[in-house]
Amino acid sequence: MNLINLTNHPSSLWSEKQREEALRLADKIVDYAFPNVMPNSTEREVSILADKVFKDIVTTYGKDVIVHLMGEFTLCFALLKRFQKECIVCVASCTERNVIEKDNGERITRFEFKRFRKYE
């Protein structure tokens, strides 16, 4: 079974912990770049894009997959509905946000992967 990484964060940049957790869920991680959604896109355009991405993933990888789904909210929601209708499990990555504030006021934010959580 494949874990389809439908995000803007390639698995090659994941922490070792995130890769290990993904490989506990599936045999292989496949990166699938989350498409860009322009702010002026209409609901109809987002729906058409969701149909296209959904069809491409199911045609290429089948329905026996887990989808790691993170990205622009309206497209995520549209995709989630399509995947769930076909009983395809989707997960989100859960992170802990760590902020380091420097003396000059600059903030450095780091996100530490903790787990995958199933969309329900």
Predicted regions and their residues:
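Long, low-complexity, Lys/Arg-enriched
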Residues: M1-V65, A78-K81, K85-E120
